[in-house]
A protein has these predicted regions:
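Short beta-strand "acidic-cap" motif of Rossmann-like dinucleotide-binding folds
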Residues: 1-3
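Conserved Rossmann-like nucleotide-cofactor binding loop
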Residues: 7, 62, 126
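Phosphate-binding loop that captures ATP/GTP phosphates
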Residues: 7-56
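A short acidic, helix-capping loop that chelates divalent metal ions and anchors anionic groups
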Residues: 10, 64-68, 188
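Residue-level signature of catalytic and energy-coupling elements of molecular machines
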Residues: 29, 57, 98, 180, ...
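Cytosolic-facing regulatory segments adjacent to core modules
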Residues: 37-39, 46-47, 51-101
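Conserved catalytic-core segment of NTP-binding enzymes
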Residues: 78-179, 188
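C-terminal lobe/tail of nucleotide-utilizing enzymes
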Residues: 139-239
């Protein structure tokens, strides 16, 4: 996983990574000849993951690092080379890039090199408008897009959530994977740990697990060319 939210990095906090542990960031790698392996942190043991592994590349979170990246940016060809090196050296099954919300250069660059674009959005007007714009950008880049609806108000039942998902799927002509309800426990847990690992029996954790399995299936089918999520296809909802 790469934290590419270069203007507001924060994944390192959720993973409990201290400043002292971060020697090299993705910023350093993209703006110099530093190899990507120097920025990789293996979180497998830290998070108690029994099967597989989780590797993480943090973004620079000091003010001078953020300002430098905003001012100079990074080269697309260098970014592609870094991703290729990371994927091949560690024999990755999947590479997740968490980018900045909204239309920023780093966001568009990450969309341009990815295989599948996953949008995460609340159902308020501002987020929906932004998701529509991002969907259009992905269309121009000819990238498959799926949408996850987040923080659905607790007053909205499961059937109503599904109807909302169907309407949005039809409006944007894309696949809505699921509608995640607002959960106060998740909200209170923000920036203090990985919820699904700390609350493994929680119903929402099961929903996240199903979502992850659906996403893996979508990515695999997209790579194999067996299933298309192009913008001219029939919109769908899952979950």
């Amino acid at each position: 996983m790469i934290d590419l939210d270069l203007e507001g990095p924060g994944l390192h906090v959720i993973f409990g990574i201290s400043d002292a542990e971060i020697k090299v960031t993705i910023n350093d790698v993209l703006q110099s000849a530093i190899p990507i392996r120097d920025a990789v942190l293996d979180l497998t043991s830290r998070l108690g993951i029994d099967s597989g592994c989780l590797l993480f590349c943090p973004a620079g979170h000091r003010l001078e690092e953020i300002l430098k990246m905003v001012d100079t940016g990074f080269n697309l060809s260098r970014f592609k080379a870094v991703l290729y090196s990371l994927a091949t050296e560690y024999q990755l099954d999947y590479l997740l890039i968490d980018s900045h919300p909204g239309i920023e250069k780093d966001t568009i660059v990450s969309m341009a090199v990815c295989d599948v674009v996953v949008l995460l959005s609340r159902v308020d007007h501002q987020d929906m408008f932004g998701s529509g714009v991002m969907n259009e950008v992905a269309s121009q880049l000819r990238k498959p897009v799926v949408l996850i609806l987040n923080m659905i108000p607790s007053s909205v039942g499961e059937k109503e959530s599904k109807k909302i998902g169907e309407k949005i799927a039809s409006l944007f002509n894309l696949q809505v994977l699921t509608a995640l309800p607002f959960n106060s426990d998740v909200f209170e847990n923000l920036s203090r740990g990985v919820f699904v690992l700390e609350h493994q029996k929680d119903p929402l954790t099961r929903k996240f697990t199903e979502l992850a399995e659906n996403m893996i299936g979508i990515i695999d089918r997209a790579l194999e060319g067996e299933e298309s999520y192009d913008h001219g296809s029939t919109p769908q909802t899952v979950g």
